[in-house]
Amino acid sequence: MASYLDFEKNIQQIDEDIINAQIKGDTEAVSILKKNLEKEISKTYKNLSDFQRLQLARHPDRPYALDYIELILNDAHEIHGDRAFRDDPAIVCFMGYLGEKKIIVIGEQKGRGTKDKIARNFGMPHPEGYRKALRVARLAEKFQIPILFLIDTPGAYPGIGAEERGQSEAIARNLYELSDLKIPTIAIVIGEGGSGGALAIGVADRLAMMKNSVFSVISPEGCAAILWNDPAKSEAATKAMKVTADDLKSQGLIDDVIDEPTNGAHRNKEAAAVAIADYVKKSLNELENIDVRELSANRMQKILKLGAYQEA
């Protein structure tokens, strides 16, 4: 059963009317309603607010890393474990083919359904998850296979056990190691890009965001609680923080924005997957013509420019 956000109520009503008309066998009404649905979707999604895009980034029906892996990879095989503590299901790693190109995909997976969400810790990786990602990244470098990172997490897990096992060290180690990989790397924020939990697999030659994704150092709710002592002001915080793909592109913090289907990735996963696959293929064609040492140097220069400013 589809899930609807508060600003999608008109869409929900038309969807329900279509189902009722189909049950009655009223083909003429179905045809008219589908045209009305297209108009309503176009109207609803034409001028989304920052807060509405945040809601879409968290939409329960939004495609996750495993959905995209299933849709874009052929002959995919999962790689498990960090070879030090355990296999963290919040991070998934696959080797497969994107068209004719061999590629490794490393993604953060939130999980669907109560049991899966709990098993995957709601997409909040432990340090062993980031160490698994790094182990697989080193394998990719060893065999000269490009990497696609799919970012989608509310943040790295802040529990006591995670901190005892070195959460901050694991994130810092990934930032250090991934910045110097001698292979082409691409990172895409497909939903939520939550702080260090996102950055830990976000150091790449190309950093892109899906149109309805967000990337921030703290959740808008957390920001509102700290600045105004009122989590209910999260909508104002979302706007002030400039967390959307267009905001971050305008500030030079990401390289590209990947357009989603008009009705959002959650209503057309296949089209969203095609958009990602096309972007990755195009980017790899560009990156594979650059010497790997130059890639590493360019990556480092891009990192050093982050946060730079000029006084007026």
UniProtKB/Swiss-Prot annotation:
Function statement: Component of the acetyl coenzyme A carboxylase (ACC) complex. First, biotin carboxylase catalyzes the carboxylation of biotin on its carrier protein (BCCP) and then the CO(2) group is transferred by the carboxyltransferase to acetyl-CoA to form malonyl-CoA.
Lineage: Bacteria, Pseudomonadati, Campylobacterota, Epsilonproteobacteria, Campylobacterales
Family listed: Belongs to the AccA family.
Pathway assignment: Lipid metabolism; malonyl-CoA biosynthesis; malonyl-CoA from acetyl-CoA: step 1/1
Catalytic class of the enzyme: transferase
Official protein name in the record: Acetyl-coenzyme A carboxylase carboxyl transferase subunit alpha
Regions crossing the membrane: none
UniProt organism field: Campylobacter jejuni subsp. jejuni serotype O:6 (strain 81116 / NCTC 11828)
Localization: Cytoplasm
